[in-house]
Structure formats: structure tokens, C-alpha cells
Swiss-Prot record:
Keywords: ATP synthesis, ATP-binding, Cell inner membrane, Cell membrane, CF(1), Hydrogen ion transport, Ion transport, Membrane, Nucleotide-binding, Translocase, Transport
Catalytic activity: ATP + H2O + 4 H(+)(in) = ADP + phosphate + 5 H(+)(out)
Enzyme type, top EC level: translocase
Full protein name: ATP synthase subunit beta
EC number of this enzyme: 7.1.2.2
Topology class, membrane: Peripheral membrane protein
Localization terms from the record: Cell inner membrane
Superkingdom of origin: Bacteria
Pfam families: ATP-synt_ab (PF00006), ATP-synt_ab_N (PF02874), ATP-synt_VA_C (PF22919)
Known role: Produces ATP from ADP in the presence of a proton gradient across the membrane. The catalytic sites are hosted primarily by the beta subunits.
Entries under CDD domains matching the protein: ATP-synt_F1_beta_C, ATP-synt_F1_beta_N, F1-ATPase_beta_CD
Keyword Repeat: no
Assembly mode: F-type ATPases have 2 components, CF(1) - the catalytic core - and CF(0) - the membrane proton channel. CF(1) has five subunits: alpha(3), beta(3), gamma(1), delta(1), epsilon(1). CF(0) has three main subunits: a(1), b(2) and c(9-12). The alpha and beta chains form an alternating ring which encloses part of the gamma chain. CF(1) is attached to CF(0) by a central stalk formed by the gamma and epsilon chains, while a peripheral stalk is formed by the delta and b chains.
Organism of provenance: Histophilus somni (strain 2336) (Haemophilus somnus)
């Protein structure tokens, strides 16, 4: 193991000088005598390497001794990681002792080759009406939850984890990338209460941590998920939030001496996203189904970060502030959300027709809103009045009480099977429930509950 010394410190970026004949390779992990781990990013020539600190650089000084480990960062993988909380280096942060894993894998790995990849069209039922109907998930697919600040990305993700972990008995890996520590804590307790903690590995690099941790923690979580996949399992990989992964790259990019690109993002934005996303894939041995929350800065979906993420996804669930302001949760926009699976060959003709019918009525209602605002409801034709009435029922029926939000709402959570979802919306489209007041459709599960609620009104 060769040794060098620190010659420059600028925030999270540190230059280390080594003997000319023992310069570390890019992505090698270096250990400072204070215990801090660095990751080599660039070789500057003259034996100097530029590194990112994976931890706080407080208290470092020039001249400190640095040793080259000769390998990339390696993290524990396998069943020993289940039920544990780890940091970017795979070290436990839950005060439950050592992980005790038999195997350690490097976090930088090649994506599966073209021959190894598999394509599946099997659907994954989530129990959330709007998602199962409008933007169904594929097993082994990639899903993005897009939304601005405070529209419910994390709550939706927690509900998905709860529903899928209870209904589907596979393992999950959760990577908390630059999110609030409070949410990480809530999440841990939610998993404990639902009795699914022993099926989840948690990897956290939260908001208060240096950019190096936030940049690499997604790869740490992904490496653990890849191990489960390569053992022949179907694994779920949750990332909250993919935007902070991009942001961490932006923070270190300028310090690494790169010119910024559009909106100040790093010039390597598309490549960094591709390196992560191409590894999140299903092979012939097992599958990784990933759900990624994507923060949308200033609700602008054309921002380079969310726009780059769109290209990699099979299903996009767009959360809308307008729908949240109506008090309809989950605030999924049924006209903006899409899925590659919404195809009659995959979901069947009935599901496809009902989903398109729902979107058609909501689109017509959106067009009529301007007329209603200026002239009022009375000026509409009878057909349009019927469209508006049904659209308002559909809007309300797309809401649903969540299990993870029971504490806040006071109403018990509901899991609705895909069969019941299609039957309910088909009934509304066919006019079977035209006589029922729209309030009865708000915050319920299946259509039977609507009829029960209507009787009490």
C-alpha cells in the first residue's frame, strides 16, 4: 500500500500527492490517518490525485498522511444487510453492532451486458387505484415519482413500499439520497410497525452530509440490490431522491474544475445518470424493480435534471400541485402520468379502454373549465353537463386513504385490487353511478364503499 500526503483542501475536494511510481487509480479508496475515506476522481499529473471526501473534511490539514487501499469502496452485501441502516461506506449507523457480512462488493460495477438483460411484461399490482389504472408498473421496470416540494413524493413511496412489501414477499433496498433525516427516521419506524423491516436494507446519505456521501450512496444501495438480484430474487430498489444525486454531482463538479453546463449543472449530468440507471436493470437470473422519487425544481419538468431522468423510465407518475390543492391525495395527475405498460397487448383491452375513457373525460372537463368559469354550468349542453358530473366523480374516486397516512388523516388505509379498480371506473364511465352524489366518491377504496357512504349521506 503506497502512502501520500494532503497538499490542498477546498471544501469536499482534496488533492493528495503520491510518489510518481505509485499513483492511485481513478475510483480507488484512500484512507486519511484521521479515519476519513477519500475517493480518487482525477489524476492531475506529477503524482497528484484529486479526490472527493466521503465524510466531513473538518479538521483536515495539509501534510496529513494518506494511504491507498488499492481498491474501490466496497460495501457489505447479502442477507446480513437486511433490517440494518448503513451509510455510504456500508458501516452500520443504527447502533446494533457489526453487519457481519461474508461478502463485500465494490460499488463501481459494469452494467449487465445486452445478452444478460431480460424483458418482462408482468404487471406489479400496487393497490393504489390511480397508479394501477393509469400508469401500471411492470415487474422489473423503472418508475419515477415526479413532483415539486411538498406534493407527496415520500408518502407515496412509503405507501408503495408498504403495499408491495406486504403483498409481495421479496426483499427491498431503500437508498435515502440527500433527503431529510426526519423522513429517514419516520421510514424506519414505519417499516418496524408494518413488520417488514427484516426484508429491507436501508442506506442513508442525508441532506446534512457532504456531497461525496450523497453522490455515492445511491451506488451503495444499488450494489446491495444487485447482489439480491444475482442470487435469483426479485428485488425492489427505492431511491429518494434522485434529484439530490444530481445536485451532489453539481456541488463537486465545479470544485473538480469542470465548466458548468445549462442551468449550472455539471457537464457530465447525462453520463452520471446513465451510469446509475443502466445498472438498475433485470437479468435472466432476477429482477430489480425500481421506484425513484424525482424532485422537480420550481415545478418545471423541463429542468435538465428531471428531463434527463425521464429518458430512463418505463412509468412516470407525475404529482401535481393543482390536484393537491383540491385536497385530492395521492395528487397524481392522470393526464400527465404515463406508462409503457398501458398497452392492450400487456394490460388487456378492457383495462386499456377504461384508462383511456377516464383520461378522455378528464381532458374534456379540463377544456370545459374555461367555459364554466366565464359562463357558468347552465350554458353547457346536457352531454357536457354529464361529462362534468362524471369527471368530478372520477377525480374524487382517484383519491384514496393511505395506510402510512392513517396517523394524519384518521381514516384507515385501503388496498384496492386492480380488478376492483377497473370495475369501479368502468361503472362510472357507463353511467351506473350518475345518481350518486360526488362527495361519496372522495377518499374511499372500492366502489362498494362509495355505495355504503352514499347511503349514510
Amino acid at each position: 500500500m503506497s502512502a501520500g500526503k494532503i497538499i490542498q483542501i477546498i471544501g469536499a475536494v482534496i488533492d493528495v500527492e503520491f510518489p510518481q511510481n505509485a499513483v492511485p487509480k481513478v475510483y480507488d479508496a484512500l484512507k486519511v490517518e484521521s479515519g476519513l475515506t477519500l475517493e480518487v476522481q482525477q489524476q492531475l499529473g506529477g503524482g497528484v490525485v484529486r479526490c472527493i471526501a466521503l465524510g466531513s473534511s473538518d479538521g483536515l490539514k495539509r501534510g496529513l498522511k494518506v494511504e491507498n487501499t488499492g481498491n474501490p469502496i466496497s460495501v457489505p452485501v447479502g442477507t446480513k444487510t437486511l433490517g440494518r441502516i448503513m451509510n455510504v461506506l456500508g458501516e452500520p449507523i443504527d447502533e446494533k453492532g457489526e453487519i457481519g457480512a461474508e461478502e463485500y462488493w465494490a460499488i463501481h460495477r459494469a452494467a449487465p451486458s445486452y445478452e444478460e438483460q431480460s424483458n418482462s411484461t408482468e404487471l406489479l399490482e400496487t393497490g393504489i387505484k390511480v397508479i394501477d389504472l393509469i400508469c401500471p408498473f411492470a415487474k422489473g421496470g423503472k418508475v419515477g415519482l415526479f413532483g415539486g416540494a411538498g406534493v407527496g413524493k415520500t408518502v407515496n413511496m412509503m405507501e408503495l413500499i408498504r403495499n408491495i412489501a406486504i403483498e409481495h414477499s421479496g426483499y427491498s433496498v431503500f437508498a435515502g439520497v440527500g433527503e431529510r433525516t426526519r423522513e429517514g427516521n419516520d421510514f424506519y419506524h414505519e417499516m418496524t410497525e408494518s413488520n417488514v423491516l427484516d426484508k429491507v436494507s436501508l442506506v442513508y446519505g442525508q441532506m446534512n452530509e457532504p456531497p461525496g456521501n450523497r453522490l455515492r450512496v445511491a451506488l451503495t444501495g444499488l450494489t446491495m440490490a444487485e447482489k439480491f438480484r444475482d442470487e435469483g430474487r426479485d428485488v425492489l430498489f427505492f431511491v429518494d431522491n434522485i434529484y439530490r444525486y444530481t445536485l451532489a454531482g453539481t456541488e463537486v463538479s465545479a470544485l473538480l474544475g469542470r465548466m458548468p453546463s445549462a442551468v449550472g449543472y455539471q457537464p457530465t449530468l447525462a453520463e452520471e445518470m446513465g451510469v446509475l440507471q443502466e445498472r438498475i436493470t433485470s437479468t435472466k437470473t432476477g429482477s430489480i424493480t425500481s421506484v425513484q422519487a424525482v424532485y422537480v425544481p420550481a415545478d418545471d419538468l423541463t429542468d435538465p435534471s428531471p428531463a434527463t431522468t425521464f429518458a430512463h423510465l418505463d412509468s412516470t407518475v407525475v404529482l401535481s400541485r393543482n390536484i393537491a390543492s383540491l385536497g385530492i391525495y395521492p395528487a397524481v395527475d392522470p393526464l400527465d402520468s404515463t406508462s409503457r405498460q398501458l398497452d392492450p397487448l400487456v394490460v388487456g383491452q378492457e383495462h386499456y379502454d377504461v384508462a383511456r375513457g377516464v383520461q378522455g373525460i378528464l381532458q374534456r372537463y379540463k377544456e370545459l373549465k374555461d367555459i364554466i368559469a366565464i359562463l357558468g354550468m347552465d350554458e353547457l349542453s346536457e352531454d357536457d353537463k354529464l361529462v362534468v358530473a362524471r369527471a368530478r366523480k372520477i377525480e374524487r374516486f382517484l383519491s384514496q386513504p393511505f395506510f402510512v397516512a392513517e396517523v394524519f388523516t384518521g381514516s384507515p388505509g385501503k388496498y384496492v385490487s386492480l380488478k376492483d379498480t377497473i370495475r369501479g371506473f368502468k361503472g362510472i364511465l357507463d353511467g351506473e353511478y350518475d345518481h350518486i352524489p360526488e362527495q361519496a366518491f372522495y377518499m374511499v377504496g372500492s366502489i362498494e364503499e362509495v355505495l355504503e357512504k352514499a347511503k349514510k349521506m
